Amino acid sequence: MAVDLVRLQLDVTDFDLARFQPYVDKCRTSGIRLTTLSELGDTPEHRRALYELNKECSADIPERGEFHTYDEYHRLRIEVPAYDPRGVVLALDGDRWIGMAATSDRRGSGFVFNEMTGVRVCHRGRGISVAMKTFGIGFAGICGVSTVRTVHHPANESAIAMNRTLGYVDADW
């Protein structure tokens, strides 16, 4: 039986940066570094680390099923026109990758798309996901669009609530 996914959309021109910047600041003052894969270096080693982080964080997605092999992941997520390392926000605690927020470039369709946002279990509940999404909101501007879209399984209530807090609204596309 097919599940009706929750479709959400954000108009970045309405995004309240002043409201969410404190999440970014809190990460920085607590020693969490926010960066992008582009700034860190889009290397084979970093792509492998991104895969491992994505795999770990995806385990909690309702009805996710088995995660891709690295080769499948690379083919489906990296070797595609929508991939841009500037859209991959990373949260680092020292050298340890603890969170990711990957957004793909769909500017040809008039938007960017939040593919995955996740934080390792031991670092959850500290606002890191909100900080990463806030830090990465400028990617839409880099791509020349003002719309960010995402989808969620309806049982992924925490992700849906976080996005709605950020200003995402239900969409019918």
Regions found by a protein language model. Give the residues of each.
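Conserved active-site alpha-helix within GNAT-family acetyltransferase domains
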Residues: 1-4, 130, 154-172
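Acyl-donor-binding surface of acyltransferase catalytic domains
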Residues: 1-42
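Hydrophobic alpha-helical core bundles mediating ligand binding, dimerization, or RNAP-core interactions
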Residues: 47-54, 73, 77, 133
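A conserved beta-strand-loop-helix scaffold within acyl/acetyltransferase catalytic domains
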Residues: 58-121
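Conserved beta-strand-loop-alpha-helix junction that forms the acyl-donor binding cleft
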Residues: 120-124, 150-160
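Conserved acetyl-CoA pyrophosphate-binding loop and the N-cap/start of the following alpha-helix
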Residues: 123, 127-135
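Conserved G/P- and acidic residue-centered "switch" motifs that form tight phosphate/ATP-binding loops
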Residues: 127, 144, 156
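Conserved GNAT acetyl-CoA-binding A-motif
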Residues: 140-152
